[in-house]
Amino acid sequence: MAARLNLGLLCVVIALGLASAPSCGDTLSDVQKRGYLRCPIIEASPGFSSINAAGEREGMDVDHCKVISAAVFGAIKIEYVPITPQTAFTLLQSGAVDVFPGGASWTFLRDTAMGLDFTGVYLYAGQGFLVRKSGRIHSIADLDGATICVAQGTTLEQNLADYFRAHRMRYRAVTFGNIERGLDAYQADRCDAFTNEVTSITGRLRELVNPQDHKILPGVISREPMAAAVRQGDPRWRDLVLWSFNAVIAAEELGISQANVDEMRKTSGSAEAQRLLGVYGDYGAKLGLSNDWAYNIIKLVGNYNDQWQRNFGPLGLDRGANRLWSDGGLLMSLPFR
């Protein structure tokens, strides 16, 4: 999430001139010739990227990689590249990876000054706080005068400063290079609260020594629209990634799931569903793909709700703003027409 991307590093990249570097070429052709997608993954982030008991990678970011692979190959062919917050964008800029699947807040500076293109919001998040149940802090207002653990050089650190300044509240930040060290410091009583995006805190809460002794405060202090990113200057690849993510949202809107996609392909009377699933039209060709590209995505990875329930359901995370627009949320697919 936002904490996983270092703003200080982004400034260094800009200073070095990498943001204005030319595109590395036709990414789709490169991926097809190579025979697999190179996908960066930040390790040990429950709900987003982790390894399960069977030794398999799982999480929303992992599923995003699978979505792109399914669209391109009709199969899951991925080389996962472990990264840190400090290397995320430099690897993408250099061409060492093909896409950044998630974890980036879509902000003005990242969109205009980093040589990146974002491909639509896939997760609406917000920055919150983890505190001890036994303490005096029961609301964000109670954080006045608190010591707060936060990841250094991130949008989280900037949000913290902006919010406390705007509300004339005092705080002392204890900064760390990554989330794990910040949580360790919080558990060692070096700070009164730990801050991160609520989705990330929810995933990590169960990893604490005594999770029942902690709680997430109600409310958030920021808006974090999360989106995948690709290199600027490669419009065909951007379109492919953007429409692949739209396909999983459109599938949920149309009632097409991993469980019923074969039946819906045969029986759906919806013209948009038939276009999406490749029954007629040549939408795949317009992306440089086979006409069953979206069918393959849904068959192999599922629609948005399939992915949410698989990755966030076990964490008890409510979809909230990530519900479909028809259910009172903010998610809406661009039309397939």
Language model segments and positions:
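Acidic, polar ligand-binding/catalytic clefts
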Residues: 66, 70, 74-142, 198-221, ...
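Extended ligand-binding regions for polar small-molecule ligands
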Residues: 62-70, 133-137, 141, 146-147, ...
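C-terminal functional modules
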Residues: 273, 277-337
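Short helix-initiation/N-cap motifs at beta->coil->alpha
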Residues: 78-90, 173-188
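Extracytoplasmic small-molecule ligand-binding "clamshell" domains
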Residues: 25-103, 283, 287, 304, ...
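Bacterial N-terminal signal peptides that target proteins for export
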Residues: 1-10
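Bilobed "Venus flytrap"/periplasmic-binding protein-like clamshell domains
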Residues: 38-47, 57-72, 105, 125-181
